[in-house]
Amino acid sequence: MLAIAGLIGCAGALATIAFRECLRQLQWWLAGADQGLVATARALPWWARLLVPTAGGLLAGLTLQYGLKWIPRKGAEDYMEAIAVGDGVLSARQSLVRSASSLCSVASGASIGREGPMVQLAAMCGSLLGRVLRHAMPVSVEHMRLLVACGAAAGITSAYNAPIAGAVFVCEIVFGAITTATLGPLLVSAVTADIIVRQFFGYGAVYAMPHFDFVSGWEVLTYLGLGLAAGMAGPLLLGLIDRARGAFARTRLPQALRLALGGLIVGALSIRVPEVWGNGYSVVNGFLHAPWLWQTVALVLVCKVGATAASAGSGAVGGVFTPTLFCGAALGLLYGTGMHALLPGAAPVPVSYAVVGMGALLAATTHAPLMSILMIFEMTLSYQVVLPLMLACITGYVTAHATGAPSVYARALARNRDDTLRLPPASSP
């Protein structure tokens, strides 16, 4: 099983690398340079900022609307559904069509993460390998689910350079428990994927973390306060996205026009705030290493939340994992700036709260505090952030859980089940 897990890790890593390269080529075609979406948006005139996300949304919607029309619905559509409640069979053709749609959305500036389709493609590799093995040997449903889970762990690792968090993500969120029977193959798959990805992109932190130290015991209380704020903000963010989905559904527009409308909203916001384009890696690194006025951070946060709700609510294929990190960083920076103004001695480095805020809001939305702690640690490669991160993540999780609001993945599973019940039989070509 471990050897098969390593093979899945290799295949999953190569699939995510191929997706990255396709995305890079699309962005190069759009801007003539590989400079990132935010830099591209800043260089465009206002009318192009409005037009590009709209056209990208329309193309993404057409890809979904007509690409899925003739595909028989065999297997689960989402990797979490295939692992948690399915038989481990993931529809390869649906995954490819949805990934193509995601390419159009992400490359044109939609406020969603590229990591969602990357994980889906890697999980698809695990499902395909399991189906091939079935012809040579008996493979139980439990083993099929584990193979898909190995692919998902490889995909998360490839997307975030976080092999430990990738394995824990699947255990904590999908399986609901960490056991030695599942953790071993997941770690092998994640480590294999990490080795391959680093051969292409090198070894380095996703977010370069500035140095900071605790200066007093009082600072612990300020991080607990940040966790409390993130725990209240998480359910509000997810609720806003759900309301946006409902609003788009009530328009009764065809799928292509809904995605185009979502792109139009993102484009309109980007005329004033181009930082809403894409997943926001460059903006978060800017939060950490450049001075920002709190008014500017607040404006960027509000517009980013609106852009994410518009993109995800319209039905664009992509994750909200990375936009959540963006919103957490902005929330943490605002909180740290306020604490520094009120208690300079207890909050000497406001940007440290940006990193901790990412983990706290992630824990509040995923209900997975251990994964959130490990994810931020591996993305920053900074041990000094772990202690305040643990405090804020646990506080954020407990606060969000106390509200009774479901996690982002529980909402997604429930939504997928409802959609499956409403779907008519597929058309024949």
Curated annotation (Swiss-Prot):
It is a multi-pass membrane protein. GO terms for biological process: response to acidic pH. GO terms for molecular function: voltage-gated chloride channel activity. It is found in: Cell inner membrane. The keyword Membrane applies. Gene3D superfamilies: Clc chloride channel. CDD domains: Voltage_gated_ClC. One of its GO terms (cellular component) is chloride channel complex. InterPro entries: Cl-channel_core, Cl-channel_volt-gated_ClcB, ClC, ClC-type_chloride_channel. Keywords: Cell inner membrane, Cell membrane, Chloride, Chloride channel, Ion channel, Ion transport, Membrane, Plasmid, Transmembrane, Transmembrane helix, Transport, Voltage-gated channel. The chain crosses the membrane at residues 1-21, 44-64, 146-166, 168-188, 200-220, 221-241, 259-279, 283-303, 315-335, 354-376, 383-405. SUPFAM superfamilies: Clc chloride channel. It comes from the Bacteria. Belongs to the chloride channel (TC 2.A.49) family. ClcB subfamily. This is Putative chloride channel protein ClcB-like.
